[in-house]
Amino acid sequence: MPTIQQLVRIGRTKMTKKSKSVALDSCPQRRGVCTRVYTTTPKKPNSAMRKVARVRLTNGNEVNAYIPGEGHNLQEHSIVLVRGGRVKDLPGVRYHIVRGALDTSGVAGRTQRRSKYGAKRPKEAKK
């Protein structure tokens, strides 16, 4: 326990918060080019074929990014926008690809949570 005089002289050291998305270099999103688009299986209790892309960002970093939603149009050399956000059951996947931005199309036929998947507002049905 420091004395008051020691605190006056030196003060307390601030705890620095470590970023969970280091490759973005303190930016909200980064542009990148897909180097590989593939599917992978999740960790133990879950079972699926999760769509993932290996992306080379504009700052030179290579990351694994998850492709959310049903169906996608990504292939090698597609330009994508990458945001932070991990996928809990995929080890090593700490980034998400933004749907509806750059070369990535929005999810077709999506009616709810459309903004998260880059889907346009559906046309109203005639009464």
Curated annotation (Swiss-Prot):
Single Gene Ontology MF annotation: structural constituent of ribosome
Entry keyword Ribonucleoprotein: yes
Source organism superkingdom: Bacteria
Keywords from the named record: Methylation, Ribonucleoprotein, Ribosomal protein, RNA-binding, rRNA-binding, tRNA-binding
General function of this protein: With S4 and S5 plays an important role in translational accuracy. Interacts with and stabilizes bases of the 16S rRNA that are involved in tRNA selection in the A site and with the mRNA backbone. Located at the interface of the 30S and 50S subunits, it traverses the body of the 30S subunit contacting proteins on the other side and probably holding the rRNA structure together. The combined cluster of proteins S8, S12 and S17 appears to hold together the shoulder and platform of the 30S subunit.
Subunit structure: Part of the 30S ribosomal subunit. Contacts proteins S8 and S17. May interact with IF1 in the 30S initiation complex.
Protein name, per record: Small ribosomal subunit protein uS12
Source organism of this protein record: Flavobacterium psychrophilum (strain ATCC 49511 / DSM 21280 / CIP 103535 / JIP02/86)
Taxonomic classification: Bacteria, Pseudomonadati, Bacteroidota, Flavobacteriia, Flavobacteriales
